[in-house]
């Protein structure tokens, strides 16, 4: 059956700021306390979406979350009206305010893990929400992510959206950022590669930075998504690269159809994995980048592998890259050599995503890949599909509501909270989502 990959990109939230919340993500740590520009950030993302949609790659949007997230502060014992809570936490525990104001839901590669209908035992598209257990600010995301996905993939005859795994470290799950699918045509059965950083009975794990994904979680997600057991491979990421800042597999590898583009040090027992894939995937091609050409540290600094690898109509592939790759002489030299060689990657497109990149999120972080047949695509909420009208509407919406300068101190401004809620109210109507946010369901609580 004919199917296409649709990229659902996350809209950057109104509270996008640099707080250094993500230990193990070196860009996040390095840019802590810098001044951010939320309006520029959301527009950089929109420009990428529109450019790819115009080039014939189906695009859709996933909205941001409600931030600052007052219900989480109430859970932490802060009381009073919303405004009083903001004031208290800003004075008493500003780090909590930063955490509940994080715009991290924009990195929708961590929203869920997707199984296309061609791989599922019941013939439906499955999406399992990620619990993002390793970081407090990300563990807040799962309930609203689930509500958003249910509002987008609302036809239960075509889609199954599963709640996140229990919030325990043993089942730490980071979503599609640790998942690849390889195969031929999108509509044919593929091989799903689940990548983990640790497992309970295995002493091999990173020493410096946390391994966020457990094998136990990956196995549970594969079961929930009803992936045919004959079409699954579980592989461990190299713990040494996790300790060099590769906090998700999509910082060191990207796949599309029959191609796996990765660093030579990406996986533990990499030769064994490559041989497995060669046996299981017709026409499989591994493009392994040697450390002598691009070091792991340069790959992390430029997000070479946090790129999008997209299939064009002629069978060739386009590599979508952040501008940092072009700015790095060695990486850019390697890339120009790559596209000149005999392999499916024949073209590159560079985007300026500096606002997201400074928090450790490149092109691949910003998108959730969903393979859909034509019938399934028609069943998706049509209001989220990117086109000229939506691009114009979202730019106008951003101009109206987004600030062009934000610091950690601004997060305590009650106006920011009100602006955000008004903006999301408007957005849910624009995207026909219904009442997906807690403030819409309970009213803006006064205490």
From Swiss-Prot:
EC number from the UniProt entry: 3.5.3.23
Catalysed reactions, semicolon-separated: N(2)-succinyl-L-arginine + 2 H2O + 2 H(+) = N(2)-succinyl-L-ornithine + 2 NH4(+) + CO2
UniProt keyword annotations, A-Z: Arginine metabolism, Hydrolase
SUPFAM superfamilies reported in the protein's UniProt record: Pentein (SSF55909)
GO biological process entries: arginine catabolic process to glutamate; arginine catabolic process to succinate
A Pfam cross-reference name: AstB
Coiled-coil regions listed in the entry: none
InterPro entries tied to this protein: AstB_sf, SuccinylArg_d-Hdrlase_AstB
Binding of substrate, residues: 19-28, 110, 137-138, 212, 250, 359
Domain of life according to the entry: Bacteria
Pathway where this protein functions: Amino-acid degradation; L-arginine degradation via AST pathway; L-glutamate and succinate from L-arginine: step 2/5
Residue numbers annotated as active site: 174, 248, 365 (nucleophile)
GO molecular function, one term: N-succinylarginine dihydrolase activity
Record's function text: Catalyzes the hydrolysis of N(2)-succinylarginine into N(2)-succinylornithine, ammonia and CO(2).
Family: Belongs to the succinylarginine dihydrolase family.
Subunit structure of this chain's protein: Homodimer.
The protein, known as: N-succinylarginine dihydrolase
């Amino acid at each position: 059956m004919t199917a296409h990959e649709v990229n659902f990109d996350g809209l950057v939230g109104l509270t996008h700021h640099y707080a250094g919340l993500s230990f193990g993500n070196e860009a996040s740590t390095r840019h802590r306390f810098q001044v951010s520009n939320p309006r520029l950030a959301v527009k950089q993302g929109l420009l990428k979406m529109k450019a790819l949609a115009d080039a014939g790659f189906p695009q859709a949007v996933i909205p941001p979350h409600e931030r600052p997230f007052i219900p989480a502060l109430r859970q932490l014992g802060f009381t009073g009206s919303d405004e009083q809570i903001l004031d208290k936490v800003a004075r008493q525990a500003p780090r909590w305010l930063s955490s509940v104001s994080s715009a991290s839901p924009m990195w929708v590669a961590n929203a869920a893990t997707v199984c296309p209908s061609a791989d599922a035992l019941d013939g439906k598209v499955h999406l399992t929400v990620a619990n993002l257990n390793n970081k407090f600010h990300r563990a807040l995301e799962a309930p609203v992510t689930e509500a958003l996905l249910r509002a987008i993939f609302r036809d239960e005859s075509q889609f199954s959206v599963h709640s996140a795994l229990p919030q325990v470290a043993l089942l730490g799950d980071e979503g599609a950022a640790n998942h690849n699918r390889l195969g031929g045509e999108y509509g044919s059965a593929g091989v799903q590669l689940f990548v983990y950083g640790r497992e309970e009975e295995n002493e091999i794990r990173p020493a410096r930075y946390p391994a966020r994904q457990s094998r136990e979680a990956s196995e549970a997600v594969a079961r929930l998504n009803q992936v045919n057991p004959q079409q699954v491979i579980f592989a461990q990421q190299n713990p040494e690269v996790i300790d060099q800042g590769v906090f998700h597999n999509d910082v060191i590898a990207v796949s599309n159809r029959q191609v796996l583009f990765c660093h030579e040090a990406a996986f533990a027992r990499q030769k064994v994995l490559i041989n497995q894939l060669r046996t299981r995937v017709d026409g499989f091609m591994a493009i392994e980048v040697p450390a002598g050409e691009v070091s792991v540290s340069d790959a992390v600094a430029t997000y070479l592998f946090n790129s999008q690898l997209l299939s064009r109509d002629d069978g060739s592939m386009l590599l979508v890259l952040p501008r940092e790759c072009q700015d790095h002489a060695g990486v850019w030299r390697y890339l120009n050599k790559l596209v000149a060689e005999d392999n499916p990657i024949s073209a590159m497109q560079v985007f300026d995503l500096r606002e997201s990149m400074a928090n450790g999120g490149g092109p691949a972080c910003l998108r959730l890949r969903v393979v859909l047949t034509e019938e399934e695509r028609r069943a998706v909420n049509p209001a989220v599909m990117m086109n000229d009208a939506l691009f114009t509407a979202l730019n106008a919406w951003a101009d109206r509501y987004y600030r062009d300068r934000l610091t950690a101190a601004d997060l305590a401004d009650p106006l920011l909270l009100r602006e955000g809620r008004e903006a999301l109210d408007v957005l849910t109507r624009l995207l026909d989502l219904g009442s997906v946010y807690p403030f819409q369901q309970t009213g803006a609580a006064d205490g």
